[in-house]
Amino acid sequence: MKVLDTTPRQDGFHMPAEFSPHYGCILIFPERSDSWQYGAYAARKAFVQVCTAIARSEKVTVCASAKQYENARRMLPPHIRVVEMSSNDSWARDYAPTFVTNGSVIRGVTWSFNAW
């Protein structure tokens, strides 16, 4: 990974609008019992439905903890990519990379989210 001293804007990059076409979506498999009722069982069922719907039109990558990896892989369809990744919550927006583009190159911007 190359870390730059410039900002994306300085290099001619911008964050595409949410409605812009994009390559794929990153989601985090629900796990935390303090965020999800009843051991996240109902949340996981709904999550699988959401992932399956999104995957009809774009690539989906699901990040799951080591503890939940096999469960996620079993519950999700085979065409949805599952990767093992530790996380603190299901909100990828708070700590996954933000992708920016200059029209031909894509960069990931990292964040140091402190959970407020």
Residue ranges and their predicted role:
Residues M1-W116:
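Histidine/cysteine-enriched polar flanking segments
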